[in-house]
């Protein structure tokens, strides 16, 4: 059964015009983009999106980074979309990411790791709703 997940192409990747190569990986691996928008997050939007990390020591640098340039927010759909997207992204730390994963290919570092993905279906539901309303998601 088709599942949906949320994905972001982060500012380090948009700065290097990697949207196309990353979208190719997504589409070549059985996921469909059913919603997409390019935008620049405000401080408030970034802090709201990453609110679960508010007490963590990296919160300020993460929100600074995520507001440093445009992002591409997406809803992806396909069989086991959450797990499949996480597999395609690779480990959070690109040094630990498997060969052929997006982070191994494109990431600049731990924070500037090119992409974000929901870690569970419940998280995906919140994250999709944060960026898209139901009318913006096709499928």
From Swiss-Prot:
Catalytic residues identified in the record: 116 (pros-phosphohistidine intermediate)
Localization per record: Cytoplasm
Role summary: Major role in the synthesis of nucleoside triphosphates other than ATP. The ATP gamma phosphate is transferred to the NDP beta phosphate via a ping-pong mechanism, using a phosphorylated active-site intermediate.
Residues that coordinate or bind ATP: 10, 58, 86, 92, 103, 113
Similarity field: Belongs to the NDK family.
Pfam families listed in its UniProt record: NDK
Catalytic activity: a 2'-deoxyribonucleoside 5'-diphosphate + ATP = a 2'-deoxyribonucleoside 5'-triphosphate + ADP; a ribonucleoside 5'-diphosphate + ATP = a ribonucleoside 5'-triphosphate + ADP
UniProtKB keywords: ATP-binding, Cytoplasm, Kinase, Magnesium, Metal-binding, Nucleotide metabolism, Nucleotide-binding, Phosphoprotein, Transferase
Name this protein carries in UniProt: Nucleoside diphosphate kinase
HAMAP family: NDP_kinase
Main location as per UniProt: cytoplasm
Annotated EC: 2.7.4.6
Domain of life: Bacteria
Subunit architecture: Homotetramer.
Gene3D superfamilies named in the record: Nucleoside diphosphate kinase-like domain
SUPFAM superfamilies in the record: Nucleoside diphosphate kinase, NDK
GO biological process, one term: UTP biosynthetic process
Needed co-factor(s): Mg(2+)
GO MF, one annotated term: ATP binding
């Amino acid at each position: 059964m088709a599942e949906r997940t949320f994905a972001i192409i982060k500012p380090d990747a948009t700065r290097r015009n990697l949207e196309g190569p990353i979208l190719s990986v997504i589409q070549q691996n059985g996921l469909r983009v059913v919603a997409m928008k390019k935008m620049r997050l405000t401080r408030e939007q970034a802090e709201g999106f990453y609110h679960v990390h508010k007490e963590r020591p990296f919160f300020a640098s993460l929100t600074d980074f995520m507001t440093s340039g445009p992002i591409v927010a997406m809803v992806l759909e396909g069989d086991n979309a959450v797990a499949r997207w996480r597999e395609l992204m690779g480990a959070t730390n690109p040094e630990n990411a498997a060969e052929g994963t997006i982070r191994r290919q494109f990431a600049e570092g731990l924070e500037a790791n090119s992409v974000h993905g929901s870690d569970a279906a419940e998280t995906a539901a919140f994250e999709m709703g944060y960026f898209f309303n139901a009318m913006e998601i096709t499928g």
